[in-house]
């Protein structure tokens, strides 16, 4: 009986070794947690806020309060998965040139009783060698 279990020992050792690897080990093509302060994460977040304001039908701009969570994935470039909090500002969207991110971030917030906060999930795909960055998914509530 002991003799029949020997072929299982090799794969069992491999499985045990894999289970002992740190959970943060990077898997090619897999999602990796990222620091919300990383410059490329900040750039993706700025782009997401800019696009949210361009695409939304809201009469006022929303600014970034904070990045709650960031992950990235290597997929012919980098795809960023961001969870962010946005807050409605007192800056109205007017006809003409839209505000850029830094201008939006300088907009004042309404009084506490009138504040509207959103939690948004964004996917941003960056391909810097092509000079392209796209918002591929957006949902806010």
Swiss-Prot record:
Signal peptide stretch: 1-26
Protein name, as recorded: Cystatin
Expression across tissues: Expressed at a low level by the venom gland (at protein level).
Highest taxon, organism lineage: Eukaryota
Keywords tagged on the record: Disulfide bond, Protease inhibitor, Secreted, Signal, Thiol protease inhibitor
Main location: secreted
SUPFAM superfamilies per record: Cystatin/monellin (SSF54403)
Residues marked Reactive site (site): 29
Disulfide bonds: 91-107, 120-140
Locus of motif Secondary area of contact: 73-77
Listed GO MF terms: cysteine-type endopeptidase inhibitor activity
Annotated family: Belongs to the cystatin family.
């Amino acid at each position: 009986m002991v003799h029949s279990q020997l072929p299982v020992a090799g794969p069992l050792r491999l499985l045990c070794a894999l289970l002992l690897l740190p959970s943060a080990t990077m898997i090619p093509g897999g999602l990796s947690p990222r620091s919300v302060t990383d410059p490329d994460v900040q750039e993706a977040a700025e782009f997401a806020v800019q696009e949210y304001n361009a695409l939304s039908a809201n009469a006022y701009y929303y600014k970034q309060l904070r990045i709650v969570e960031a992950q990235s994935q290597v997929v012919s470039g980098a795809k960023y998965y961001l969870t962010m909090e946005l807050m409605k500002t007192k800056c109205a969207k007017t006809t003409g040139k839209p505000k850029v991110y830094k201008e939006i971030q300088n907009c004042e917030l309404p009084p506490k009783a009138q504040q509207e906060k959103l939690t948004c999930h964004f996917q941003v795909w960056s391909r810097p060698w092509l000079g392209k960055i796209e918002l591929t998914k957006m949902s806010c509530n």
